[in-house]
Structures are given as C-alpha cells and as structure tokens.
Amino acid sequence: MSREDLSIAEDLNQVSKPLLKVKLLEVLGQGDFKHLKALVDNEFQPKDDPSVQQVLNLILHYAVQVAPILLIKEIVAHWVDQVGDEKSSSKSDDGIHLDLNYQDENGNTPLHLAAAQSRSDVISFLLSQKSINDCVKNKAHQQPLDMCKDLNVAQMIQLKRDDYFLETVHSLRAAMNKRDFSKLDSIWKNPRNLNLLDINGIDPETGTTLLYEYSQKKDIEMCQWLLKHGAEATVKDGKGRSPLDLVKNIKLPAKPSNNVTPEIKLKNLLEKNLREQAIVHEDVASSKPPTYKGFLKKWTNFAHGYKLRWFILSGDGNLSYYKDQSHVDRPRGTLKVSTCRLHIDSSEKLNFELLGGITGTTRWRLKGNHPIETTRWVNAIQSAIRFAKDKEILNKKKAVPPSLALKNKSPALISHSKTQGSLPEASQYYQHTLHKEVIQPSSVSLYRRPSNNLSVVSSEIQLNDNLTESGKRFVSKMIENRLDGSKTPVGVHTGSALQRVRSSNTLKSNRSMQSGSGVASPIDKVPNGANLSQSNTTTGSTASLSDNNYIDNFEGDEANSDDEEEDLGINFDRDEEYIKAQYGPYKEKLDMYEQAISIELSSLIELIEQEEPSPEVWLTIKKSLINTSTIFGKLKDLTYKRDKRLVDMVSKQGDVNNVWVQSVKELEMELSNKTERLASIDKERRGLKKILHKKLLESHATAGNKESLENDKEQESDTTASTLGQIAKFISATKEEDEASDADEFYDAAELVDEVTELTEAHPEISTAAAPKHAPPPVPNETDNDSQYVQDEKSKIESNVEKTSQKFEKQNNLVTEDEPKTDQSLKNFKAEDKESQVKEKTKEIASSVIGEKTIVAVTTVQKRKEEYLLKEGSYLGYEDGIRKRLSMDKDDRPKISLWAVLKSMVGKDMTRMTLPVTFNEPTSLLQRVAEDLEYSELLDQAATFEDSTLRTLYVAAFTASSYASTTKRVAKPFNPLLGETFEYSRPDKQYRFFTEQVSHHPPISATWTESPRWDFWGESFVDTKFNGRSFNVKHLGLWHIKLRPNDNEKEELYTWKKPNNTVIGILIGNPQVDNHGEVNVVNHTTGDHCKLYFKARGWRSSGAYEITGEVYNKKKQKVWILGGHWNEAIFAKKVVKDGDLSLEKTRTAASAGNGPTDDGTKFLIWKANDRPEEPFNLTPFAITLNAPQPHLLPWLPPTDTRLRPDQRAMEDGRYDEAGDEKFRVEEKQRAARRKREENNLEYHPQWFVRDTHPITKAKYWRYTGKYWVKRRDHDLKDCGDIF
C-alpha cells in the first residue's frame, strides 16, 4: 500500500471532534445517563485518541450548562474521583475518570461555568463534593464567585465556603491534638485548603501562632512538621512574641554532644529555618498597600434596606462599591479610607459602620454574610487606614513609621518595630481568601513566598486611633464573640489557627476567548468595560474632599447620580417572589436553553467548516437542528410564561403601591383637615377673648357715669351680662386646651402685631418717641412702619429711592436692547487718581440712591471699613436702584403632580434629584443665601447698643429673620454650577455681598458680606433627603458675624449653625416649609450666648412657626428672653427678677416703637415685611436679586448668576427653553469635570480658600480679597466660561 493510501486510511479512521461534540450535546439535553454511557462506549473510541480525550474531559463542562441536575449528579457519581474515596478509583469500569476541577482553554472549571449561569442547584451540589476547589482562577484571574451574576448565588457560595473553612480548621486542630500526622498531611495536600488556610495565623484563644505554641511545649516533632509546611520562626503573635524569642537566651554548647536537650534541638531547628527563609525570601519584602474585594451588604434607606454590593479596597486607599462585578467601571460610591474611622459594636457579629469624608458626615452601614467575613473586612479596612496614615507620616517627616518598618528587609528593623509595640491584630487569625484580596499576617510580610498577586499587607492591623472606643473594645473581644452564633460545633474556634494567605488579582478585562474545545464560556459575555487595575481602580470617580480643598471630582451629577440606588439591586430580606422578580422567573431554565442553543449552533458551524459532509454527518446535523428547534420552542414558551408572570407581578405591585399612596394621602388629608379645624377653633377663641377684654374696658370707662346712665343702660347691661356669660362659659370649656398649649406661654405674634398697629394709630406720638437712654439714635428701618426711627429721615430716604426707581420704570427693570456704555470716566482714570476717583464715584452713586447718608460710621474701625468699601468701588453699577417687579404678572408654569415625580426618588439626596424645570423657581441657591440679608438693619441696630447681651439679642433675631421668606417658597432653586458667582450691593443699606460655588459634590457655596458696622460670612452646606412624605434639610455649615459696635473699637465675633428645614404636605399637594431645632448663637468675644428654639409644627396651627429663646451673659445668667413667630414678628423683654423667666400670659404695655426697655415690658424686635402676591411666591427682596440692571451688566463677571441662560428663561416664562438650557449647561459642567479628570487636575475656587479660623479653630472658606479689586479694574472677563 502506498503512502498516499495510508494517509487516506488514517483520515478515514481519525475521530471527528466537532461530530463528537454535537452528538454529546444531543444526549446531554435528553438527561438520560444510560444514553450518555452508550454514546461514550460506542462513539468515543479509541479512548487514547487526543480528540476523544479532549471532549471526554469536557463532559462535565457541557453538562453544567445544558443538562438537568439529575444527570450531572449521575456523571459525578460514576465518573468523578473524590478525595479520600477509596472506591473512587475502581467505581468506573469503563476507564473514564473526570476531574472536578479540570480547566478548559479559558481556564474555567465546571464550577466557573455553573456560577456564570447562576445554576444554584448545580453549584450547591458541586460545592458539596470533597474534591471541589472553589479557589481556582481562570485566565481572567476570576474565581467562580467572581463570575456570579445572581447576588443570591454569590451569597450562597460565600456561606458554604465559610462553613467549609470552619469545618477544616476544626479537623486540623483535632488532628494536631491527636498527633495524627497522616491526617494532617492529607488535609494539607488538599489544594483548596492551601488556598484557604494560613499556618502562620494567630489562634484567637491562645493569642499565639501554632509554631509558638508547640515551641513553648518543646514539641520538636510537631515543630518540624509545621516548619516543613510553611511555618516561619519570625512570625510574631498577638503580643509581639515570636518562636525565636523562646530560645534566644539558650546557649549552644561549645562542642557537639550526643546528649542534646530539647531546648537546644528547638533552637537549632528554628535558627536553621531562619537562615533558609532569609536566603529564599531575600528579595520578597513587600510594601504594597492593602487591597481587598468581595461582597458586602450596604444599607441604602428605609424603603430598600440592605442591598448586596461588590466592594473593592484598592491600593490607592479608596474603598468603592459597585452594583456587581460586571459594573466595576461605574462605582456607585467611593470613600478615601485615610479620612475614615471604623465603628463596631461588640454585640453585633455581622454589622459595622464606616464613618468618613472630610466633613465626617458620610456614613456607610455595612453588613457581612458571615461573622468571619465581617472580621476580614474589619481587618482589611483597619489595615488600609493604618497604611494610609503611615504613608502620610512617611511623606511629611521622611521617617519610617513602625508599621512600615516590618516591611523592610533588615532584621534590625524587626526588633525596632517590636520595641515600638507594633502588634498584629488577634482577629487576623480568621483571614482566609474568599474570592478576595486577603490580609497577610503582620510579621510574615518580611519572609513571604514570592507571589505575582496583589496581596494585602496587614502589619498595620493593630488598635489605632481610627477606631472608636466601642470599636477598640470590640476588636479586643472579637474572637470570643464572633463565632457564638455560627452553626459550627463548640470548640471549633479553639483550633482555627490556620489560614493560608492568598490573594487574587484585581479584575482584568474579560474579553472573548474562543475555546478550542467549543465550550461557550459565559465569561465571553462579560462587557469589555470591566477593567480594573491597581492604579486606576477609582480614578475619575473618587469623591476626595481634603480639609484644604473641596474638589469637583465625583462621578455623579444630578442627571446621572444613582449612588442611593433606589429600585436597583436586591434586598435579601424580601420574600422569594420579589427576589425572583428582580432577575425574572424561570431564569435558570431560560439561561440553560439559551446556552444549549448557543453551544449547539457553534458546534454545528465548527462541524460544517472542518468536515466534508458524509451521510453520517448530514444525519447528525439534521438531528442537531431538530434538537435546536425543539429547545428554541421550549425557550419561546418559557419566555412567554415569564413575561406574562412579570406583567402580572408588576400590575399587582402597582396596585399595592396605589393603595399605599392613596392610604397615606387620605391620612395626610385627614391630618390637614384636623389642623385647619383646630386653627379655626383657636382663632374663634382668641376673638371671643378679645371681645371680652374690650367689653371689660368699656365697663370701666363708663363706671364714673354709672349713676346718670343707670336707667338708660339697664337693658343694654342685661344684654352685655348675657353675652359675657356665654363668652366666659366658652373660655371655661377651652381652658384645659388653652393651658396645655405651649403657644400661650408667649404673645401670639399676629395678635400682638395687630395691637401694636392699633396703638400706633391711636397714639401717633409713639412712633416718634425718644430712643431708650442706653442706645444711641438707631438706624432707620425702611420696612417697619412701627419702628422708633426718625420719621422725616425715613421719608427722605423713601423719596430718593422712589425717584430713582421711577427713572427706570419705563424699562420695567429689564435689560434693554441698547446696553448702556460703561462710564468712560472710570475707564480713562489715570493710575495715580484711580482709587480716589472710584471712591468719589461710589459716593456719588450711594448719594443718588439714598440721598443723605443714614448709617454714619462712628468708630475708627467703622470708618476704615467704609473707606475700604468705597475705594474698591463696591456700588459701581448699582445706579439703577432695585427692581420692584418681574416681567411676568403671574406664575403660569405647567401643572405637574409633585408626588408623581418624587415617588421614585425616596431616599435620595435632593441636590442629586433630576426634576422637571417647572419645579424650579427663577433663583439660584447662591441668591437664596443672599436672602439672609433682607433684614440687615437688625445688625446695624445691634451695633448701636452699649449692652453686649442686647447686641447678642439682635444678632440672634437677625439669624431667625431670614426664614420669613421661606413660607410658600417650596419650589427648588437652581443648583449653582461649579465656579458660579453672585454679587449684590445695596448702597441704601451700605453693604456688599459676594458668593461663589466652591464645590459641586457636595454642593457648597462660600459667601462674604461686608458693611461698615459688620461682616457676615459662612458656607451654605446642607445634607438633604427625601423620605417619601417630606424633604429634610440639615445645615452643616458654620456662619459668622463680625460686629463693630459704636461704643468701642473692639470687634465681636458671633457664630451659629442654622436650624433644620422640612418641606411637608407633599402627598396632599399642599407643601409647606417648617423650620425646627435648636440654634446656639455664641459671642466669642464677650462670652454671651443666645439659645433659640424653633418649634416643629404640631397639631395646632398656633404652634406653627413658633420661636423662643434666651440670652445669657458670660456668667451664664439669663438676661433677655424672646418669643414670637419667625414668619411674622419677634418680641423680647428683659428678665428683671429671678421668677420672671418667660413671656407670661398677662398683658402689659408693649413698646411699639421705642425699642428695648429695661423695666421688663415687652418690646418689638423685628416684624416681617409685607408679602404681596408675586409669581413663584417670591418676596419683594428676592425679586431684586436677579435683576439685569442696565448699568450693572458691564461690571459683572461671565460667571455671575444673572447671566445664567436657563434661570433667565425661567424668569421670563420660557419654560421649554429653560429646560433645554439647563440640560446644556449641566452637560458642559460634566464635560469640564471629565477633562479635569483626564488631565489629573484638581479644581480650586477662584475667590475663596479653605482656612482655619484663628478664634473658633474651625475650618471655613476665607475670601481672598481679589474679586472687588478686579471688578473695579474691569478685569473679570477671563474668570471662566461656565454658561
């Protein structure tokens, strides 16, 4: 026979691998082991053929993807060898021996593929096999757990691995106690155990390593076994002791002797190990930062509870979390561990908290799936915190901290670190890899086996200042408490001193890898974006806010932020049906059918491409296509059933939600109706009391003429007596309610304001009475008709303002098409004359607006400040006066249900909400800050008083007065863009205001206001949440006032934090603003302080808007008390005796216009301005803020809020354009942020810097002093392009 004939014969006899795969898939889909065995016996011949062997080895790989669980169990029972099964080698009589951990071309084991398809029944069965190894990594460096898409399955794998670990540790300790070395060897030979156990771990019960324990017992044989299997003599225990310390004082004999003591043997053994380790690991010292990854449950909100999330602690010190492993390119949140501290409750075995962020307000409530897992995470995070702190020390002082010294190769550094008391954490004993980066024992880092994997160095694991006190107590007791609730038998923890330190590389790119075996590995389906490296784990998504620099470097904006993750992920406390709805019913079967079709078709293509079709091949192809068609039919039917079930579940859930919403709405309506009814009753009661009071006064007035009028008034007296009797009866009936009301402790503001008005009308001389003897002539208040200010001066001011306003009334205070030219005289100033001419020009503008000056600088510091404001041209451009009205007459925004939009945003931060533009008002949050200055006259008046406690009283009234403008203002202001600014000067009130948005996430506005008598600055920094029924706003920023009193040259510093705000009544469509909480206004110069109490809205309307307070001197004595309503008026009186500690019910003469009194009578401090009906419910003051006055526009920088297009369109009623512009400017902001991230640039504010206040020692935003100078010089054109 020729060679050509032999070649043809060989080709005919060669086994077709694609044909075998197609036939195998057909049989696996039938689920009958007898058919599978017949196929293998008849078709898979000869057994030694390479193609046959390849397909045989992959039987289990195909089975876990397309076969039912019963067939998989039979395959394992008949063909898979088990560890420790003596019959396993002989149970297969056909010579087939499958490896449960065999890896295909992509490195996937059957467990990998089952995990990728989330086949929980298959995974549970495989993990129950003795020979399984769930720590094997594929070529993408993923363990089976890393490939799970179903979070339920991932949690199951975690729990099973933890249970196996505890069981193995218990067995290992039992074998050690029995000195069963054969059992120890068998345990240690298991590859899975090598990945999970660390022989150098610390026993939590004894606090020592195994080698130290048996060295102390002088058990030479056991020490030899431990050293042979990787124990190291240099590893220190929980008290900083190593086995070498036990033998360091033993002296070796000068000459060898046959009579060697156990101590000498032990010393020789340990020193030999030390020499070997020094040689083997000479270059293995590790100084890599701690890394870790895995699943944890994170608390989101009350609506969704805990959700399982994928966490990664990266080497750059960032802890980030993701929805799952496939979304590692989109972190939902990031914390810099160097700014964090751990809080752990020793009574909790699974929960711990991470408190962090520069403000200390970030709070992550985390929960492990198992006590051991929680322990590992606690140690990993604590290790990372210590590493970051030590790195900072190293960078600043160029010194090696103790925790980093252990990583140095020099043995001298080991002893040094010991003297420094750098002790490892006892609880690191439980560290074993769980698909994660895992912690290394601290002392082992010097002599660790070489590894290409990223490892966690835990020399930092020790009690440190980053743990709270309860956390430190917990770490000390962690071991004894941690396993109490586990199902492991008692005594297991006594031997769990073994953990192999292993680590897995961070996730790499999971690009498609075509398997030559034809196994359609689900790893091919992982998105290409899942690429995470050590260097760029969280680049571009880190919210890193250092003390000295707030930066805009956060992934989320209000249009794409989802870190509160509502409606995402799984809450494992819910019922099974709801969990299935998240993934979809019949998911496992659908995945199996899809995978079967995919593999079948790929195998057919491979068969057609590689074979010349023969009759047998065509028959196989036909059967395969029929089988594929059958599977597709099942897939179609099951998909229809799934969709129908999902629709039913969604409809049912929608009905449940509607019932819930309707129930809550009805409850809100009922509460609202009761509140209105109580309010009407209360008003009626007050009216009757007023009638009674009036009748009594009339009866006293006519008492002198009683005799002469007795006959004429007899009938009227009877009527009066009858009326008074009825009134008295009504008042008696409501007496209990009246006495129970806290509101009656103080004057009702509305009632007393009416009384003051009546007094003023009846006695005009009150308004022109002399000022109190302890105060100089006060500053005019243009808004208070009942004040004590001089009437003719006030008339003069109003007259001048009115003239100036009428000058531009024809323009309706809007921008004209012909923009006025900038005053050329200012542009042509000579350098030497510029400041003086600017000063004169500023005086001229102020004079044109207010006429004769009404606020006179008295002291040197006041005059110096006034000169400073004039020199910098603070009022240039404000010649036009203030705007009195908007361009539109009424608010004609489209009506949209607020609840319909907000119901999907429960639990979210308000600043991250994306709402339709119609829910906005045409103001910015920067302008909302400016509204605090509406009643700045209170500060001017405070500076006139000699008494420091009285100054404190008026400053406190100023802090409360700003909330009068919040009533009816429930629309959302525009969120400022990063770098956006706003200026506002009032020549008539002699102050200038400036603010800048210095941070976007979190949103922070820094502000600075200056006036001759006072300065006002602070930061608008709030934490906001929507809980379904109300918006909650918590103010975090500290506010400051520097007052310059008229009576001395010493300035006074006041600070306070604003009360909390709540918007209620959202469900019933009647939103209202409520302010509540305690405010402490502190005078740091004199030691005086005022406590203000904003009362939360209760059942009765008389309790709404209520405010009370007390002023104390530096001796802690109460000097003044105040009360009223923050939306109407505030009154006060002086405490003249010990028992006079509140504003009592008894009416006394109220001073309407004379200001403070010292005799204990009540006087009016402040009264709110009138609120006429205006579009968007804006106040008259708010209307002035966004006015594009013609003379002002040329002076403004391009970042000023008045030039913002979306807000301007909103003000003019162009709502569609406003929405489009809002989207455009926010996209522009995001593009700028991405550009900064690409270039590794940090954002720095232009006009403010983060600093520490010399008096309060608190961080604050300090104004650099450059804005008004550049404005005066027309040097603001290049300050930024943000609109």
From Swiss-Prot:
Residues found modified as Phosphothreonine: T488, T783
Spans of repeat ANK: 106-134, 206-235
InterPro entries, per database record: Ankyrin_rpt, Ankyrin_rpt-contain_sf, OSBP_sf, Oxysterol-bd, Oxysterol-bd_CS, PH-like_dom_sf, PH_domain
Compositional bias (Polar residues): 504-518, 530-551
Endpoints of the signal sequence: none
Biological function: Lipid transport protein (LTP) involved in non-vesicular transfer of lipids between membranes. Functions in phosphoinositide-coupled directional transport of various lipids by carrying the lipid molecule in a hydrophobic pocket and transferring it between membranes through the cytosol. Involved in maintenance of intracellular sterol distribution and homeostasis. Binds and transports sterol. Plays a role in the positive regulation of vesicular transport of ceramide from the ER to the Golgi, negatively regulating COPII-mediated ER export of cargos.
Family per similarity comment: Belongs to the OSBP family.
Name of the protein in its database record: Oxysterol-binding protein homolog 2
Organism field: Saccharomyces cerevisiae (strain ATCC 204508 / S288c)
